[in-house]
Each structure stands twice: as C-alpha cells, then as structure tokens.
Design a protein with these regions (language model features):
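Glycine-rich G1-box
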Residues: 183
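Flexible, glycine-/charge-rich segments associated with ATP-binding catalytic modules
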Residues: 1-30, 89, 94-97, 197, ...
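Conserved ATP-binding N-box helix of the HATPase_c
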Residues: 55-57, 135-170, 228-230
Length: 308
C-alpha cells in the first residue's frame, strides 16, 4: 500500500490553484493507501473557500477507502466556527461562545438533492439581511447560485457537493465557492449520448461551458454562461477548475490554462457588492428574474417595503 505525505500552510496567503497543486497527488491514491496531511493554521484570516477545498478533498478520499491521517499545527477559531475541524474529523476545544454569523457567512456545508433548495434559500437570506449589497447584484447572485448548485446535482454523477460563502463588507465583496469531486466538465460534456461536443478536448470543454446554449443534452446551457457574464461585467473574479485545466476570468477577460489535476469541478467567485450589473444585459428578453427575486424576499420577509 502506498503512503503519501503532504503539507499545507495556511499561516501564509495561498491561492486556490496552489492548494490544488498541493492536493493533486492525493487523487492518485488507491483504496487502502494512506495520506499523511499536515495543516498549519493560525488566527490570522484564512478564507473559508480555501478550507472548503481541503475539507471536501479529505472527505472524498476517505469515502474512497483512503486513510487520511491529519496533523494540525497551530489553531484557528475561525476555522472552528465554520466547522472545518469537525468536517475533517479533528477534535477542537472551542473556548469561545458561538455567536450568530451576523449575516456574514455560512458554515462549510455539503448538500444533496434534499438540502439543495433550503441551502440556497439560507444563502440568499443571509445576503439579503445585510442590507449593504446592491440589489442588482443580489438578483443575479440569486439566479447564478441556483444554477451552479443544480449543475452539480445534474452533471457530477454524485449525490451532491460542497459550498462556502463569506461576505466582507469592508472590502465590499462576496467570496462564494461551490465544488464537487465528481465526473468533471469534460466528461459530462463529451460522454452524454445527446451531446454535440463529444470530440471536444478538456480545454475546449471549459471554454464551451461558459458559452450560451452549450449543453450535453440536459439543461439549457445557460447557468455558467450567465455566471461568467455577471462576473465579467461586475469586474469580479471567476475560477472554474476541472481536471487538468482551469478557466480564470478577471478584469473583464478570461483565459484557459493547463494546471495540476483536480478531481471534479470547482467554481469560485469573487463578487463586488457595489458594482451593479443590469440583468437585461445577460438574461433573455422578458426574463422574470426581478419578479422571481422579489417573490423570494416576500416569501421570507413579507413586503419589501421599498428598503432599496
């Protein structure tokens, strides 16, 4: 049986692509193999989406019969508060009072068909309650969040995925990451019997997935198109990582690069909460997005009362 040793240092800034580079060799392990993983933490801010990438990978490996032995150096009350320790099976004594998330974040969570829509509602309610986020941003995020999470249920070949969200009011930004360890975009796009894109390469599949109307035969092929257009017009950042390639959209443009292997699909967004985007620049004519969002708000909060 093989044994692999890896180390992640969260006491220094680390981007998602670097995390994937570190974790990539673990996806080659076989049932019965062992991963010795050392994680360095501190109470300086670590992003929840970075912790999500690690927690989801650990759970994936364990579910496939790989023994994951974890050593933690240092500690992070923030990591504990968003349930990182419990998700990776490491005991942690919480010497603090767990306060409400104050509409700033959700704990790291997995979701499946049964919890998909309640979790979407929870995320949208948290963002609405802050009151400091542009309404046009909230409307498009409401749509894109549902589409991305639904894509995982439909296309990953698994029962569900993982999500993290954090709002930074001082920076006027939201960081949102949704991921799974399933089939990946290339497999989904090229192997479905009704797909028109069976000859696409992995890099081409990433490019195709953000084009309007591209689908493997399931769905309308609009969710990632709308998401990418939203981020480009919002001047935010978008990372879509699947297999050995990733798409990076930033500063109004996007590029596709070859990278280290990631098992499944990762969609990570950084959204500027003060940069409005007109839904009519993205959505089909006569789309009911504003009405759909207002209906959602009325459902949970009663009349909007012109808070906006």
């Amino acid at each position: 049986m093989a044994e692999l040793t890896l180390s992640i240092n969260f006491t220094q800034p680390i981007i998602h692509r670097e995390l994937i580079r570190i974790l990539s060799p673990a996806y080659q392990l076989m049932p019965g193999d062992t991963l010795n993983l050392t994680i360095a933490l501190s109470n300086s801010m670590v992003h929840s989406d970075s912790l999500l990438i690690v927690a989801s990978a650990i759970n994936h490996l364990r579910s496939n019969g790989i023994e994951v032995l974890i050593t933690i150096h240092g500690q992070s009350t923030y990591a504990s508060r968003i349930n990182f320790y419990s998700l990776i099976g490491v005991p942690f004594q919480e010497n603090y009072i767990r306060r409400n998330n104050a509409g700033r974040f959700i704990e790291l969570k997995s979701f499946d068909r049964d919890t998909l829509y309640p979790l979407q509602d929870e995320l949208n309610m948290i963002l609405y309650q802050n009151g400091g986020i542009n309404k046009e941003v909230l409307q498009l995020l409401f749509y894109c969040l549902g589409e991305i999470m639904d894509n995982i249920i439909v296309h990953s070949g698994l029962d569900g995925g993982w999500v993290s969200a954090q709002y930074y009011p001082n920076r006027q930004e939201i960081r949102l990451t949704i991921c799974d360890n399933g089939n990946g975009i290339h497999h989904s796009l090229t192997t479905h019997p009704e797909s028109k894109y069976k000859q696409a390469s992995e890099a081409e599949a990433l490019d195709l997935c953000i084009q309007r109307g591209v689908t493997n035969g399931e769905g309308l092929g609009f969710g990632l198109f709308a998401t990418s257009q939203f981020i480009l017009k919002n001047d935010g950042d978008l990372l879509i990582y699947s297999g050995n390639h990733y798409l990076l959209a930033t500063h109004g443009n996007y590029e596709i690069h070859e990278g280290d292997f990631y098992k499944g699909t990762l969609v990570s967004l950084r959204i500027n909460t003060d940069v409005p985007v007109d839904y009519k620049d993205i959505m089909p004519a006569h789309h009911t997005l504003p009405d759909d969002y207002d209906f959602f708000i009325d459902k949970y909060f009663g009349e909007d009362n012109e808070l906006w």
